[in-house]
A protein has these predicted regions:
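Gly/serine-rich nucleotide phosphate-binding loop at the start of the catalytic core
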Residues: 1-107, 115, 123, 216, ...
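Active-site periphery "cap/insert" segments of enzyme catalytic domains
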Residues: 73-156, 168-169, 195, 202, ...
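Generic hydrophobic, helix-prone segments enriched in Leu/Val/Ile
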Residues: 54-55, 63, 68-71, 86-90, ...
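Active-site glycine-rich loop that binds ribose-phosphate moieties when present
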Residues: 140-146, 173-197
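Class I SAM-dependent methyltransferase SAM-binding "motif I" and its flanking Rossmann-like core
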Residues: 158-165
């Protein structure tokens, strides 16, 4: 069976240049964060919604003063334009960050497929440095857009499932984006329409290794797929593939997350933190590499 490596922003913790979600929000908002909010998307909304005074999309006069209409409302371009400005700023920040060396190790795995929630194209660039042919199978939706990597008869695919920095408008961020996107994911699951052309098919029908991906409660698109898969296994009595989640043990919700994932028919491998993410990810790499031999 083919193998998929699914990774998130956790691998960018290796090295000095990685940017956390919190730091990214601080960079684009210039506003103090409300750290007690557990949800990533709610933290985003709590900062972005009050940004009318600093968003470039707000219309101003030549003195920098906000323009007000006859009813006292701030004049601005469309909400879509404001959102694009924010996404463009995110893309610019991520584009300036030097990639973690761990992308070299991911490329060394030679997996059939790579799926990432990250916006940057670091893995694509890594394959390009190896003189491999890279073709973009373009689509308006991150559900179907992907890159095909080929060399010497070997082929892999890379999917940035939450959009990418080359097309900032494709970036999935905030509640509206996640809700709309998850609705489309669920439609694919229920109707099977274009299933085989989307990354969703890889989670259901290839062996999947998940690393560097916190699977926060608000990652509702991925949870929807995992719940759907677990229900299908229960109803049919058949399991098409194996999903392995590598959980780094820092003592926070390890037991509860492990139990939940195992109930959803996901195998969990607990990795000791060992004082650094680097040591933990070295162990994960060896585990995946050994499994794929």
């Amino acid at each position: 069976m083919e193998t998929t490596v699914l990774f998130g922003n956790g691998i960018n913790r290796i090295g000095n240049n990685g940017v956390s979600w919190d730091k990214l929000l601080e960079s684009i908002s210039q506003r103090k964060q409300l750290h007690y909010i557990p949800s990533n998307t709610l933290r985003y909304e709590s900062i972005i919604i009050p940004m009318d005074e600093i968003t470039p999309a707000v219309l101003r006069d030549k003195y920098g003063r906000r323009l007000i209409d006859s009813e006292g409302q701030v004049l601005c371009t469309s909400e879509n334009t404001e959102t694009f400005v924010i996404k463009q700023k995110i893309a610019n920040i991520l584009d300036e960050i030097e990639p973690s060396y761990y992308y070299q190790k991911l490329a060394d795995l030679n997996a059939n497929h790579y799926v990432t929630t990250n916006y940057e194209l670091s893995l694509v660039q890594e394959f390009k440095t190896r003189k491999m042919n890279v073709d973009c199978i373009d689509d308006k939706s991150p559900l179907f857009k992907h890159f095909i990597i080929q060399k010497d008869g070997k082929k892999s695919s890379i999917w940035n499932i939450h959009g990418d920095i080359i097309h900032p408008q494709s970036i999935i961020i905030g509640y509206a984006d996640y809700s709309n996107y998850t609705t489309k994911v669920h439609h694919i699951l229920e109707t099977k329409r274009r299933l085989k052309k989307s990354w969703v098919n890889l989670i259901l029908n290839t062996n999947v290794h998940i690393l560097g991906y916190g699977l926060a409660d608000d990652e509702i698109d991925m949870w929807d797929i995992l719940v759907y898969r677990a229900r299908m296994i229960r109803h049919t009595g058949k399991q098409n593939n194996e999903i392995i989640y590598y959980l780094i043990d820092k003592g926070i919700r390890v037991r509860s997350k492990r139990m939940l994932l195992e109930r959803l028919k996901v195998s969990v491998v607990v990795i000791p933190y060992g004082g650094s993410y680097e040591s933990a990810y070295q162990i994960i790499y060896k585990r995946i590499s050994d499994t794929m031999k």
